[in-house]
């Protein structure tokens, strides 16, 4: 086994011990192959292992290591640094928590932590007055009456699941007519089907109470974002930390939702574009776009703020809304941003930066 420091990745995306693929020739996803190459360039060896494959009594893990491009499942010494890459919905499982606790107790650096739920993320930004002015009014939903109180101040409001992602479960509520309310969703509740109905106040209260029994929600001001061809538009900035521990802009993606959808998510049928496309699309309209430097500056300020909360934070995906006056709004924060909207070069750079940041942490 190589004497290079080991960059371990806790992940559930590789085959388990009982999976036939673990005994046959196995090649992980391209991003892991890219990370293995980048790790070598930083003087590290990459080992992909499942949380249950940690062997504390033996001081080892059983994982997948690439040697000359061939991946084999083998026992290695304990990693010198660990990148946590377990899916968010699995991050609190007992074996994942046990592995995380073991490495922390041992003093092994772990990076790419969970930042918290949407309420915790909002409360952190609330402490910074300059950043909070870019955040929609937000509060934890405790009772249905809060919805009607916020609707007295804004044309529409959104109910967002505290632990939601990909637009799942978000409700848009707005006054309709004759004391009724428009209620819409791209992926509603457990059905994950679109919803577009008008409800009386009593019906809406009943719906809110029922949904809140299933899971906690955040109540948020609706921002009047720009639309192009009836599709809601927002921005995704993807940032990662480099060899010096500094934040680097990897990508700026313009997202446009399906016509009349309440979300712009790629997973919900949206499309991806570049900044030049957006400039062309709004030309001749009464819409002011911020300068690119403004977008990048705000993104980096937000990233630096969350670094104070989590010093080993490695990556951030920020969803920024744009209103017609050119103001930027922080709509969502992803500490483990998906790469499906990035191009091949950007995905490769993500892998390089993870290896760079691991090397940076090992030197501290």
Where are the regions that the model predicts?
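Extreme N-terminal starter segment of soluble prokaryotic enzymes
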Residues: 2-7
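C-terminal active-site "lid" helix and adjoining low-complexity regulatory extension at the edge
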Residues: 272-314, 322-364
């Amino acid at each position: 086994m190589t004497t290079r420091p080991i960059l371990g990745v806790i992940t559930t995306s590789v085959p388990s011990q009982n999976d036939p693929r673990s005994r046959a020739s196995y090649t992980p996803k391209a991003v892991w192959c890219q990370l293995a190459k980048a790790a070598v360039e930083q003087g590290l060896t990459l080992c992909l292992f499942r949380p249950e494959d940690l062997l504390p009594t033996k001081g080892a893990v059983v994982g997948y290591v690439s040697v000359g491009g061939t991946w084999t499942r083998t026992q290695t010494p304990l990693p010198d640094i660990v990148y946590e890459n377990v899916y968010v919905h699995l991050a609190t499982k007992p074996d994942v928590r046990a592995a995380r606790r073991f490495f922390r107790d041992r003093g092994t650096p772990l990076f790419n932590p969970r930042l918290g739920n949407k309420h915790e993320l909002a409360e952190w930004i609330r402490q910074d007055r300059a950043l909070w002015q870019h955040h929609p009014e937000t509060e934890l939903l405790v009772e249905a009456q809060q919805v009607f109180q916020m609707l007295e101040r804004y044309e529409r409001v959104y109910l967002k699941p505290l632990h939601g992602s990909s637009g799942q479960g978000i409700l848009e509520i707005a006054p309709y007519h004759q004391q009724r309310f428009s209620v819409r969703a791209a992926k509603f509740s457990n059905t994950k089907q679109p919803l577009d109905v008008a409800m009386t106040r009593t019906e809406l209260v009943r719906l809110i109470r029922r949904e809140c029994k299933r899971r906690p929600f955040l109540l948020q001001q609706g921002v009047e974002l720009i639309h192009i061809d009836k599709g809601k538009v927002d921005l995704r900035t993807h940032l990662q930390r480099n060899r010096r521990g500094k934040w680097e802009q990897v990508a700026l993606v313009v997202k446009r939702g399906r016509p009349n959808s309440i979300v712009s998510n790629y997973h919900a049928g949206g499309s991806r574009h570049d900044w030049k496309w957006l400039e062309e699309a709004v030309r001749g309209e009464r819409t002011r776009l911020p300068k690119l430097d403004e977008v990048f500056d705000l993104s980096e300020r937000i990233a630096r703020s969350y670094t104070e909360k989590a010093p080993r934070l490695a990556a951030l995906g920020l969803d920024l809304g744009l209103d017609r006056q050119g103001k930027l709004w922080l709509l969502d924060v992803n500490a483990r941003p998906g790469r499906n909207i990035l191009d091949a070069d950007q995905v490769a750079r993500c892998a390089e930066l993870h290896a760079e940041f691991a090397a940076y942490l090992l030197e501290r």
